[in-house]
Regions:
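Conserved hydrophobic/aromatic beta-strand scaffold that supports enzyme active sites
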Residues: 5, 90, 97, 105, ...
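Divalent metal-coordination and catalytic microenvironments
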Residues: 14, 29, 43-44, 70, ...
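Hydrophobic "anchor" residues on beta-strands that sit immediately upstream
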Residues: 8-13, 39-40, 103, 142-143, ...
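Conserved beta-sheet core of the metallophosphoesterase superfamily
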Residues: 120-187
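Short, well-ordered beta-to-alpha junction loops that form the rim of enzyme active sites
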Residues: 101-110, 147-148
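Cytochrome P450 core scaffold surrounding the K-helix E-X-X-R motif
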Residues: 114-120
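Short, glycine/acidic-enriched loop or turn micro-motifs at the edges of active sites
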Residues: 17, 46-47, 110, 150, ...
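Active-site neighborhood of divalent metal-dependent phosphoester bond hydrolases
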Residues: 5-6, 18-99, 125-134
């Protein structure tokens, strides 16, 4: 895809822990922020990493879920200040949801009867659609989410909810969709 300065590019999170080059992914997202209107959402993997880096939280869960790959990509040498300042600023700029006309975006899911600005972070970052697919949101907008992998490589479109996680981390596709035209891009 080739977004222009007038385009809004919303990325749904899990930029770290999902492959061998988390650092390169963050560099590219920072670069995109200078080329287009980029809105980055906070995923559960960014949350786990920031809890360790900023709050010295226990690190075992993060390391079990891809943190080792992230540390390797940053050539971790034992100090929790391994993130370059520009990367830490990027992570601190991530939001839990974003709204556009007709759509809203979260990393994982939402509670259908609660306004977006009152949603629990756990719901927005951690809830799996495998556990429960939410009903339409009270805003009437279509939800666009990731987090729950569609292992068949297809976008899940339920009308009121679109899940674009097509299992990139597990060997599937990295997927982008232009919501107004419906055009889809996928790379492996």
């Amino acid at each position: 895809i080739h977004p222009t300065a007038e385009d809004t590019l919303v990325t749904l999170g899990d930029y770290v822990d999902r492959g061998p080059d988390s650092r390169g992914v963050i560099e590219r997202l920072i670069q995109l922020g200078g080329e287009t209107r980029h809105v980055g959402l906070m995923g559960n993997h960014e949350e786990m990493m920031l809890e360790v880096v900023k709050h010295q939280a226990p690190h075992e869960m993060w390391l079990r879920h891809g943190g080792v790959d992230t540390l390797d990509s940053y050539a971790f040498a034992g100090s929790l200040d391994f993130l370059p300042d520009s990367h830490l600023e990027f992570f601190e700029s991530l939001v839990d949801f974003h709204e556009e006309r007709g759509h809203f975006f979260t990393h994982a899911a939402y509670a259908p009867k609660i306004p977006l600005n009152e949603q629990a972070a756990d719901m927005l970052r951690w809830h799996s659609l495998d556990d429960m697919v939410p009903q339409p949101h009270l805003s009437g907008k279509v939800a666009v989410v990731g987090h729950t992998a569609n292992k068949d490589g297809e976008i899940l479109d339920l009308g009121h909810l679109i899940c674009v996680d097509t299992y990139c981390y597990g060997g599937g596709w990295l997927t982008a969709i232009e919501l107004h035209s419906g055009q889809v891009w996928q790379v492996s």
